[in-house]
Regions:
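N-terminal interaction/assembly modules
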Residues: 1-132
Length: 132
C-alpha cells in the first residue's frame, strides 16, 4: 500500500488529536473505562478520515503514563496541578505524551496542534498557557 500524502496524514492526525482530547477529557472527568470510551467514539463519530492508530495511541498511552507525564511538566507550572483547568491538563498530558513517545512528529507540530485545540475547547486564554 502506498503511503498517504502528507496533507492527508496531517488532517487525519488532527482529527485523531481532536477526538483524542475529547476522549481523554471524558476519561479525566468521568473515569469511564477506556474500552468503553473508545467504543462510544467509534460508534458516535465518523472515523473514515481519522488516523485510528494515532487516536488509539493517545487514548491508551496517556492514561498508561499519566503519572510520568504529569511529573515531567508539573515542575514547569506556575500553579498546582490540581488547579489546572481539565482541558489544559488534558492537553498538557497529550502534548507531553506526543513529545516523548511520537518522535516521528516534529515538536513544532505538537505545540501548534495543542494550541489550536486549546483555542477551540479551552477557556479564553488557555491557548496562551498551553503555548508556555
Amino acid at each position: 500500500m502506498a503511503p498517504k500524502p502528507h496533507n492527508t496524514l496531517a488532517a487525519e492526525r488532527r482529527k485523531a488529536r481532536h477526538y483524542g482530547m475529547q476522549a481523554l477529557y471524558q476519561w479525566t472527568m468521568a473515569g469511564a473505562a477506556l474500552s468503553d470510551i473508545e467504543a462510544e467514539f467509534r460508534t458516535d463519530y465518523d472515523f473514515s478520515h481519522v488516523d485510528l492508530e494515532y487516536f488509539q495511541a493517545l487514548l491508551h498511552g496517556v492514561p498508561a503514563q499519566v503519572d510520568e507525564l504529569e511529573a515531567a511538566f508539573e515542575p514547569l507550572l506556575d500553579r498546582k496541578l490540581s488547579e489546572l483547568d481539565p482541558i489544559e491538563r488534558t492537553l498538557l498530558r497529550m502534548g507531553t505524551f506526543e513529545l516523548r513517545e511520537r518522535l516521528d512528529v516534529p515538536y513544532k507540530v505538537v505545540i501548534i496542534e495543542a494550541v489550536a485545540l486549546a483555542k477551540k475547547f479551552g477557556a479564553t486564554d488557555s491557548h496562551k498557557y498551553i503555548n508556555g
